[in-house]
């Protein structure tokens, strides 16, 4: 295999194992054995297990955040709160709900494991993007203070991660046969409306 192929194979294998077992419960030896590479390869390409996790998450977050900002920059000056929230949520659902994307599961596992290093890495990646969105929402809802917007943004992100991780399993269990609950476009629209109402309420 070429260097590029070897590196990608390690990333793909780590993604699968982190999603299945969690970061803490996955050893480098498990990753290298499943990827059929030697143990030194992880250090060579990534510098260790933690940096491997960061690159795996960063490879998804960076294009996602770039698309969010592209859509935000395309808004007209009279944009609504819903327009801003749509720019934030739609790309996440489009990218992270793909069948082969285990990132929501990995993030959920890391949250349960209280992985502070990953949380700080994500914060560094997201902070500049979040600042843009907070400013854009504040423009449409000037009566809200920064603390109020941040708290509601926390609830929005929590709702997004729940939807991505559970795939509406609870709603589908309550009402079997509701096919629209399997439609990502429908789910995205409902989440956008739900979060818009949450931000807009006095």
For the regions a protein language model found, what residue spans apply to each?
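N-terminal intrinsically disordered/low-complexity leader segments
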Residues: 1-3
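Helix-turn-helix
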Residues: 9, 17-51, 55
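Short, amphipathic alpha-helical "lid/cap" segments that border enzyme active or binding sites
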Residues: 11, 65, 82-89, 153, ...
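Small/polar-rich, solvent-exposed N-terminal microdomains that initiate assembly or binding
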Residues: 42, 54-82
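C-terminal peripheral helix-coil segments that are non-catalytic and often amphipathic
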Residues: 94, 98, 124-154, 159-202
């Amino acid at each position: 295999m070429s260097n590029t192929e070897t590196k990608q194979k390690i990333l793909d294998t780590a993604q699968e194992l982190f999603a299945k077992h969690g970061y803490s419960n996955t050893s480098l030896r498990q990753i290298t054995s499943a990827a059929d590479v030697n143990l030194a390869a992880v250090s060579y390409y990534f510098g260790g297990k933690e940096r491997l996790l960061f690159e795996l998450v960063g490879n998804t977050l960076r294009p996602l955040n770039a698309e969010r900002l592209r859509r935000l920059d395309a808004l007209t000056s009279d944009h609504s709160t819903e327009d801003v929230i749509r720019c934030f949520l739609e790309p996440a659902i489009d990218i992270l709900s793909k069948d082969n994307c285990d990132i929501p599961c990995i993030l959920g596992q890391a949250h349960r494991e209280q992985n502070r290093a990953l949380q700080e890495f994500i914060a560094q990646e997201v902070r500049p993007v979040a600042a843009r969105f907070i400013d854009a929402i504040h423009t449409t809802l000037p009566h809200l203070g920064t603390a109020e917007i941040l708290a509601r943004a926390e609830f929005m992100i929590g709702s997004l991660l729940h939807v991505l991780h559970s795939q509406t399993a609870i709603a589908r269990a309550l009402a079997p046969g509701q096919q629209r609950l399997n439609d990502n476009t429908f789910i995205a629209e409902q989440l956008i409306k739900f979060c818009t109402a949450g931000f807009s309420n006095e």
